[in-house]
Structure formats: structure tokens, C-alpha cells
Regions:
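ATP-binding glycine-rich phosphate-binding loop
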Residues: 27-45
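Active-site Asp-x-Gly
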Residues: 200, 211-263
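A glycine-centered beta->alpha junction motif in the catalytic cores
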Residues: 51-54, 99-115, 155-166, 271-287
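ATP/Mg2+ or Mg2+-diphosphate-binding catalytic cores
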Residues: 2-9, 152-164, 275-308
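Catalytic-loop signature of eukaryotic-like protein kinases
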Residues: 204, 208-210
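A conserved alpha-helical element in kinase catalytic cores
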Residues: 11-18, 51-98, 114-123, 127
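Juxta-kinase regulatory segment immediately upstream of eukaryotic protein kinase catalytic domains
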Residues: 1-32
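A cross-family kinase active-site recognition segment
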Residues: 112-174, 198, 308
């Protein structure tokens, strides 16, 4: 495969992101003595610096997402919901430095000996949904699906058979033709799934984004916060984890997952994962992460069995 970022280019990008975070922190009055990279994939923690963005992402849209993340985390923290909160040492807004968009968060010590229990995390996701129901922020319907980027990514993948075969691209495009109207239009979604309540949801698989701190578990990573069905947050997790969520939902006093909506969320979630391969030239590790998803998707019914 050709056209991938080299290790040297990745190292330079990481170093540039660190430099931007340090400079932005100092501009905001923080004393920075020994910066460390805690995580280097999509979004580092503490000073979160997205370095690889979807093809249709604009600076304005990213700034709105980052502000929404800061706002909901601050609101949840004020309600007593266990979250990683924004840093109280700087203004609660995103900043841009040297072309990098940044947000600042409180440092929380991670329990590195803890093995994630995704069934327990799925169970706890219901409590998060119960807390989010009354969030007053203005959110767009399924904005986290980023349909423009998904369409653009399919176009890019059509030129990269080394990343996704032409047959796979053809199937993905036909699936997206079926699913896209339900993603773009709240009216179309509600007509297809009558009676399904929409609410603020995490947007990015909260069972996989529960932070295990030394003082307890914390909800985190709300950069894809959106208005949608709760099923969106359980997409592609499978029956066992969905059953754990349903148990938590009963305890939290909210509805169980709807099978039809879950099939829709699964189908869109798989397409979003597959089309993330378009980012692989800038983030080569995605090939290793996403190849198993592509292989699983090939064995699933067309569009997850969703019909219109």
C-alpha cells in the first residue's frame, strides 16, 4: 500500500500537537513544565488535540462540537453525574493554536490495572442516558453520523482499492443510499420508527469510553454528543451487551432498546466504521483496527436488515 503517513511524519505531527497544546496553555496562563503524551490516536486527554479529522469536517463545525462537549460535561458534573470535567483553570471554550483545535480538561489518574468490563459499562450507560434526558443544550439530530463525511469517504475509498475492494465500496454505497435519508432527516426517521423518543445521547459508544479512574469510573469523551435514539450508543455491541443495557434501563426507569432501531443503528455504525478507512493514509493503524469490522460486515444482511 502507498500514500500512508510515515513514522517520521506521524512523530512530527505528534510533536507539533504537543507544541501547540503547550503554547495554548501558556497563553491561557497555565504553567507548563513537563508535557506528556497520554494517548496518541484521535484525541489525547487533558489537552485534547484532534489531529485527524473526517474529510467534510469544517473548523466551524469542529468548534461547535468541542463547545458542546465542554458544555455537557460541565452540566453533568454540576448535576452530580460522574464525568471528567473541563479544566477550571482556563475559560470553558475551545482554542486554536498553530492550526490545531484544543480543549482543556481536568487530569484524572487512570487505574491502569483495571480490565474493562463492557457488560458493566453497558449497564451503566443507561444511567448516563437517564441523566442526559434533561440536558437543556440545543442539539442537532444525529449530527454525529456526519453524513457529508461518510459520503465523501465513500468517494475517496472508490479510488483506493488497497483499502476497500470495489465490490465492498459498491455494497457500502447501496447501503448508504437506503440509510442516508433516515440519518439526514428527523422527519424521515420518525416516520420509519414511530413512537421512538429522541434525546441527547453520548454519540460515541459510551461503554467503550468509560474512564476507569483510581477514584472511580467516569463518563468521558462527549465530542460526538447528538440528539438521537438511545440505540445509537449501543450500535454494533451485540446481544450480550445490549441485554446488560436493558437491565440498567429497567433500573433507571427508561425504555429498553428497540430491535428495529438497533438494526438501523448497527447498520449505520458499521458503515461509519468501514468508511473510517479513508483516514488510514493519515492514521495507518486504522487498517489493523478496522479490517476485522469489514470482514464481519461482509457476513451481515444488506443494510443490517433495515427496510424502508
Amino acid at each position: 500500500m502507498t500514500g500512508f503517513a510515515t513514522p517520521e511524519e506521524l512523530a512530527r505531527r505528534t510533536a507539533s500537537a504537543v507544541d501547540a497544546a503547550v503554547a495554548a496553555g501558556r497563553d491561557l496562563g497555565l504553567t507548563v513544565t513537563d508535557p506528556r503524551v497520554l494517548h496518541d490516536l484521535f484525541s489525547p486527554v487533558v489537552a485534547r488535540v484532534p489531529v485527524v479529522l473526517p474529510p467534510a469536517e469544517t473548523p466551524e463545525a469542529l468548534a461547535r462540537r468541542q463547545q458542546a462537549e465542554l458544555d455537557v460535561a460541565h452540566w453533568l458534573d454540576a448535576q452530580g453525574t460522574p464525568v471528567i470535567p473541563p479544566s477550571p483553570l482556563v475559560p470553558r471554550r475551545p482554542v486554536t493554536r498553530d492550526g490545531f483545535p484544543l480543549t482543556f480538561w481536568q487530569y484524572v489518574e487512570e487505574d491502569r490495572d483495571r480490565v474493562p468490563d463492557y457488560a458493566a459499562n453497558s449497564h451503566r450507560t443507561a444511567a448516563l442516558h437517564a441523566a442526559l434526558r434533561s440536558y437543556p443544550g440545543d442539539l442537532s439530530f444525529l449530527s454525529t453520523a456526519d453524513p457529508d463525511s461518510l459520503s465523501a469517504s465513500l468517494g475517496l475509498l472508490a479510488t483506493r482499492p488497497d483499502l476497500l475492494s470495489p465490490d465492498d465500496v459498491d455494497r457500502a454505497r447501496r447501503e448508504w443510499q437506503l440509510l442516508e435519508p433516515l440519518v439526514r432527516s428527523r422527519t424521515a426517521f420518525e416516520a420509519a420508527f414511530p413512537g421512538i423518543e429522541l434525546q441527547p445521547v453520548h454519540g460515541d459508544c459510551p461503554p467503550a469510553n468509560l474512564f476507569h479512574g483510581t477514584a472511580g469510573d467516569l463518563y468521558a469523551d462527549f465530542e460526538l454528543l447528538t440528539l438521537g435514539p438511545v440505540e445509537w450508543d449501543l450500535a454494533t455491541l451485540g446481544p450480550e451487551l445490549c441485554a446488560a443495557y436493558d437491565q440498567g434501563a429497567a433500573e433507571a426507569g427508561i425504555r429498553r432498546l428497540d430491535e428495529r432501531v438497533l438494526r438501523f443503528a448497527d447498520a449505520v455504525g458499521r458503515l461509519r466504521g468501514i468508511t473510517a478507512l479513508a483516514l488510514a493514509p493519515r492514521l495507518p493503524v486504522l487498517v489493523e483496527y478496522l479490517t476485522p469490522l469489514v470482514e464481519t460486515w461482509r457476513q451481515t444482511p444488506f443494510a443490517g436488515g433495515v427496510e424502508r
